[in-house]
Amino acid sequence: MTATVSHAGPQVVILTGVSGSGKSTALRALEDAGFYCVDNLPIVFLEKLLELSGHTAGEVSRMALVVDAREGRFLVEAPRIIRELRQKGADVEVLFLDASDEALVRRYSETRRRHPLAGEGGTVPDGIAAERLALADVRGIADEVIDTTTLNVHELKRLVTRRFVAGEGAKLGVTLVSFGFRFGIPTHADLVLDVRFLPNPFFVPELKPHPGTDPRVAEFVLGQADAKAFLERLTDLLGFLLPRYRNEGKSYLTIAIGCTGGKHRSVALAAALAERLEGSGQPVRLWHRDVEKE
């Protein structure tokens, strides 16, 4: 008998990706946010789980599950399974977590664990290569891919929480991330803007110790004629882009604004842009990634 999923079905997040990329961390973040979470659920049981959730009087409205490369049927049948669940009313999103080979090798070295696909006598790089090959098709159908190479545990948890929890109901979720080029460009960003053309408060002794959230630093940065012109033009550009992204079915946009260290200029400008967007009715999630780094 085929299970029936109502059109008011639960929100389902399928977490997948390479081993060591942070799937367990992402799952914990969603569990903390109130999702019903299952680790390594065989995909054949997902439809049954959704059917049972329909008899819980709304108690299970959001669920997340981890599926990895050892779930052979998911790798083969993922597109069909996800398509059928969506046709039956389930709100299914696939999040694929990735990281560079170097980062994965380092993480396995730190935990002293064997790679699950390394095989007898195989090395961690062997396992990584085998897993990438096995997951290639699944990566291709993911709604979003997040590269966790430069993210620590806390940054990944914040990112996942903002992605699936904050600002619910918005047709297009916008996240503004201030960052420092010194610490790397956010790999999950859709748009990257470089504001190092502006005078740097770092070289003003009385401003150097204070972040861009400090009114004195913000006044110094935003008081520049070029900063004002930049904000005007960027606001106009986003006013053009956001509805068109939305019309094309994009549900999430990350805009990264960077300066040298991520403490002064990018912070002030990201906050000012967030204020402008929110003033126009666009919900915004603001994250100052590197403001506390030295």
From Swiss-Prot:
Question: Which keywords appear in this protein's UniProt record, sorted alphabetically?
Answer: ATP-binding, GTP-binding, Nucleotide-binding
Positions bound to ATP? G17, V18, S19, G20, S21, G22, K23, S24
**Which domain of life, per UniProt?**
Bacteria
Q: Which SMART domains match?
A: AAA
A Gene Ontology MF term for this entry?
Answer: ATP binding
Keyword hit for Repressor:
no
Q: Where does GTP bind?
A: D68, A69, R70, E71
Q: Which Pfam families match?
A: PapZ_C, RapZ-like_N
Q: Which NCBIfam families match?
A: PRK05416.1
The protein's role, per its UniProt record: Displays ATPase and GTPase activities.
**What family is reported?**
Belongs to the RapZ-like family.
Q: Under which name does UniProt file this protein?
A: Nucleotide-binding protein AnaeK_0154
The organism named in the record is Anaeromyxobacter sp. (strain K)
